[in-house]
UniProtKB/Swiss-Prot annotation:
Renumbered residue ranges of the record's region Disordered: 95-191
Protein keywords: Amelogenesis imperfecta, Biomineralization, Disease variant, Extracellular matrix, Phosphoprotein, Repeat, Secreted, Signal
GO MF annotation, one: identical protein binding
Organism: Homo sapiens (Human)
Protein name: Amelogenin, X isoform
Amino acid composition bias (Pro residues), ranges on this chain: 118-171
Described purpose of this protein according to its UniProt entry: Plays a role in biomineralization. Seems to regulate the formation of crystallites during the secretory stage of tooth enamel development. Thought to play a major role in the structural organization and mineralization of developing enamel.
GO biological-process terms attached to the record: amelogenesis; biomineral tissue development; cell adhesion; chondrocyte differentiation; enamel mineralization; epithelial to mesenchymal transition; odontogenesis of dentin-containing tooth; osteoblast differentiation
Compositional bias ranges of the Low complexity kind: 95-117
Amino acid sequence: MGTWILFACLLGAAFAMPLPPHPGHPGYINFSYEVLTPLKWYQSIRPPYPSYGYEPMGGWLHHQIIPVLSQQHPPTHTLQPHHHIPVVPAQQPVIPQQPMMPVPGQHSMTPIQHHQPNLPPPAQQPYQPQPVQPQPHQPMQPQPPVHPMQPLPPQPPLPPMFPMQPLPPMLPDLTLEAWPSTDKTKREEVD
C-alpha cells in the first residue's frame, strides 16, 4: 500500500514539473494541458469515425455497417411517421369513448360497461362537492376541466401547502449593561 502511495506521489510530481521549452510546447505547462496533449495526439492518429455512437467492435466492422445503417434508417424513419399518424388518431378517439360514451350496440363494450359504472361514481363524487364547498383542510382541490379548449375562469389562490406557524414573540432590544469586571483593581474602581 505504501509503495503505491509513493508511486502515485512521484507520478504526480513528474506531471507537475515544468518541461524545458521545445517545439510545439510552451515552456511551462500545467497538468490539464499535459494530459490533453496525448489525448489530442491519440485522436489525430485514429481515423475519423461518425460521432453518433461508440464502436466497441473496432473500425473494420463498423465501416461495413455504416452503409447498411445509413441506407436503412431514412426509409424506416419516413415510413414510421406515416404508420403512426393514422394509428394514433384512430386509437385516441376509441379509448375515451369507452368510459365516457358507452355504445349499447357493441358487445365488446358490455363487460367494460359493467365494470366502469362502479369506478367513475366514486371518482366523480369527491370532485363535485369540492368546488361547491371548499374545505380549508385540503390544500389541493382537483377540478375536472369542462372543455380542454375553453380557458378556465380565474380561481382564487389555493391555501399554502404548509401553513405558516405563528412565530414566537421577539425579545425587545435591551440596552447592554456593563459586566462586572474580573480584575480586582477594576472591581474596586467600579464599586
